[in-house]
């Protein structure tokens, strides 16, 4: 029989805003074998549950708690029986399981991050079972579902590091007594893209294809045409262009959040060595760095 501390008393002057508990970074490699042709999904999954009762917090009564070890095991078993077609579908399966299996679970939130494996390919021929780690952006998702509602689905890209050596500048900004930054018409532009978007509720979505489309848009608007590039007057303008094109080309998308750090590369002064360095040798600086953020959504249609 479970024992808890009866001498604990509820404080009527304090109330919870939100509670949750779960298991983080549950790692799984799922292999789908179709004859000799194998497909893989490696993921790290974090699950948070909110219960209808707060007695575990207030009184130390654990009788409603689903152990976090059970949550870990559930992720493993669902991967076996449901597979992982997409990380978004897998996250929805986990939410649905806990909400349907336990009446006292009122909220499930699942974060899944996919390891970027890519199938070996040469001269258009794909290998049947060999993969290479290819970190050109990490695919992640967040799914939250309340007992009384549909799942709210976000997908995203992170750790997509890009750089261009020209077609970027920064001019016309405010200058005061503390400004030392010179205006520049031509500079390196490097960033590590983080973007997250929310889907319309209740729509059937090809999550994998949509993610590929958004990543292509990010690369396209950052780099521009392959033969000449595209000028960026600011990180803000590039961020906005990505959002506008994504919302235009992906009808399933409701809104989009982007964060772009401005990773600096500065020309190294070689004048003391009698050398002129014309932006050929640059010094990468990890910090400090600027960071530009923005969230854009579709405007509601006018009823007039």
Curated annotation (Swiss-Prot):
<dbReference type="GO" id="GO:0006145">
    <property type="term" value="P:purine nucleobase catabolic process"/>
</dbReference>
<feature type="modified residue" description="N6-acetyllysine; alternate">
    <location>
        <position position="10"/>
    </location>
</feature>
<keyword id="KW-0659">Purine metabolism</keyword>
<feature type="modified residue" description="Phosphoserine">
    <location>
        <position position="39"/>
    </location>
</feature>
<dbReference type="InterPro" id="IPR019842">
    <property type="entry name" value="Uricase_CS"/>
</dbReference>
<keyword id="KW-0597">Phosphoprotein</keyword>
<dbReference type="GO" id="GO:0004846">
    <property type="term" value="F:urate oxidase activity"/>
</dbReference>
<feature type="modified residue" description="Phosphoserine">
    <location>
        <position position="232"/>
    </location>
</feature>
<feature type="active site" description="Charge relay system">
    <location>
        <position position="264"/>
    </location>
</feature>
<feature type="modified residue" description="N6-acetyllysine">
    <location>
        <position position="164"/>
    </location>
</feature>
<feature type="short sequence motif" description="Microbody targeting signal">
    <location>
        <begin position="302"/>
        <end position="304"/>
    </location>
</feature>
<keyword id="KW-0576">Peroxisome</keyword>
<feature type="modified residue" description="N6-acetyllysine">
    <location>
        <position position="175"/>
    </location>
</feature>
<protein>
    <recommendedName>
        <fullName>Uricase</fullName>
        <ecNumber>1.7.3.3</ecNumber>
    </recommendedName>
</protein>
<feature type="binding site">
    <location>
        <position position="235"/>
    </location>
    <ligand>
        <name>urate</name>
    </ligand>
</feature>
<comment type="pathway">
    <text>Purine metabolism; urate degradation; (S)-allantoin from urate: step 1/3.</text>
</comment>
<comment type="function">
    <text>Catalyzes the oxidation of uric acid to 5-hydroxyisourate, which is further processed to form (S)-allantoin.</text>
</comment>
<feature type="modified residue" description="N6-acetyllysine">
    <location>
        <position position="118"/>
    </location>
</feature>
<feature type="modified residue" description="N6-succinyllysine; alternate">
    <location>
        <position position="10"/>
    </location>
</feature>
<feature type="modified residue" description="N6-acetyllysine; alternate">
    <location>
        <position position="221"/>
    </location>
</feature>
<feature type="modified residue" description="N6-acetyllysine">
    <location>
        <position position="122"/>
    </location>
</feature>
<dbReference type="GO" id="GO:0019628">
    <property type="term" value="P:urate catabolic process"/>
</dbReference>
<comment type="similarity">
    <text>Belongs to the uricase family.</text>
</comment>
<dbReference type="GO" id="GO:0005777">
    <property type="term" value="C:peroxisome"/>
</dbReference>
<feature type="modified residue" description="Phosphoserine">
    <location>
        <position position="63"/>
    </location>
</feature>
<feature type="binding site">
    <location>
        <position position="68"/>
    </location>
    <ligand>
        <name>urate</name>
    </ligand>
</feature>
<feature type="binding site">
    <location>
        <position position="262"/>
    </location>
    <ligand>
        <name>urate</name>
    </ligand>
</feature>
<feature type="modified residue" description="N6-succinyllysine; alternate">
    <location>
        <position position="228"/>
    </location>
</feature>
<feature type="modified residue" description="N6-acetyllysine">
    <location>
        <position position="185"/>
    </location>
</feature>
<feature type="binding site">
    <location>
        <position position="69"/>
    </location>
    <ligand>
        <name>urate</name>
    </ligand>
</feature>
<feature type="modified residue" description="N6-acetyllysine">
    <location>
        <position position="36"/>
    </location>
</feature>
<feature type="binding site">
    <location>
        <position position="236"/>
    </location>
    <ligand>
        <name>urate</name>
    </ligand>
</feature>
<keyword id="KW-0007">Acetylation</keyword>
<feature type="modified residue" description="N6-acetyllysine; alternate">
    <location>
        <position position="228"/>
    </location>
</feature>
<feature type="binding site">
    <location>
        <position position="170"/>
    </location>
    <ligand>
        <name>urate</name>
    </ligand>
</feature>
<feature type="active site" description="Charge relay system">
    <location>
        <position position="68"/>
    </location>
</feature>
<feature type="modified residue" description="N6-succinyllysine; alternate">
    <location>
        <position position="23"/>
    </location>
</feature>
<keyword id="KW-0560">Oxidoreductase</keyword>
<feature type="modified residue" description="N6-acetyllysine; alternate">
    <location>
        <position position="23"/>
    </location>
</feature>
<feature type="modified residue" description="N6-acetyllysine">
    <location>
        <position position="278"/>
    </location>
</feature>
<feature type="binding site">
    <location>
        <position position="187"/>
    </location>
    <ligand>
        <name>urate</name>
    </ligand>
</feature>
<dbReference type="InterPro" id="IPR002042">
    <property type="entry name" value="Uricase"/>
</dbReference>
């Amino acid at each position: 029989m479970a024992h808890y501390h009866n001498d604990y008393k509820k404080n009527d002057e304090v109330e919870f805003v939100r509670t949750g508990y779960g298991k983080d970074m549950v790692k799984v490699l799922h292999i789908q074998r179709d004859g000799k042709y194998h497909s893989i999904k490696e993921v790290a999954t974090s699950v948070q549950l909110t219960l209808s009762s707060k007695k575990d917090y207030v009184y130390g009564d654990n009788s409603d708690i689903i152990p976090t070890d059970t949550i870990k095991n559930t992720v493993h078993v669902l991967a076996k029986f449901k597979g992982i077609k997409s990380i978004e579908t897998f996250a929805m399966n986990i939410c649905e399981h806990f909400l349907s299996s336990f009446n006292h679970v009122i909220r499930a939130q699942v974060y899944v991050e996919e390891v970027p494996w890519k199938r070996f390919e040469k001269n258009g021929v794909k290998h049947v079972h060999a993969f290479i780690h290819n970190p050109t952006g990490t695919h992640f998702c967040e799914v939250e579902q309340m007992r009384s509602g549909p799942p709210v689905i976000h997908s995203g890209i992170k750790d997509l590091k890009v750089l261009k050596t020209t077609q970027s500048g920064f001019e016309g900004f405010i200058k005061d007594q503390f400004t030392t930054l010179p205006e520049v018409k031509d500079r390196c532009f490097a960033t590590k893209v983080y973007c997250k978007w929310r889907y319309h509720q209740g729509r059937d979505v090809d999550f994998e294809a949509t993610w590929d489309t958004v990543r292509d848009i990010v690369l396209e608007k950052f780099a521009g045409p392959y033969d000449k590039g595209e000028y960026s007057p600011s990180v803000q303008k590039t961020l906005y262009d990505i959002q506008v094109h994504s919302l235009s080309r992906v009808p399933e998308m409701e809104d989009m959040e982007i964060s772009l750090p401005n990773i600096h590369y500065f020309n190294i002064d070689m004048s003391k060595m009698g050398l002129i360095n014309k932006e050929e040798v640059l010094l990468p600086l990890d910090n400090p760095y600027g960071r530009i953020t923005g969230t854009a959504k579709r405007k509601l249609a006018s009823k007039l």
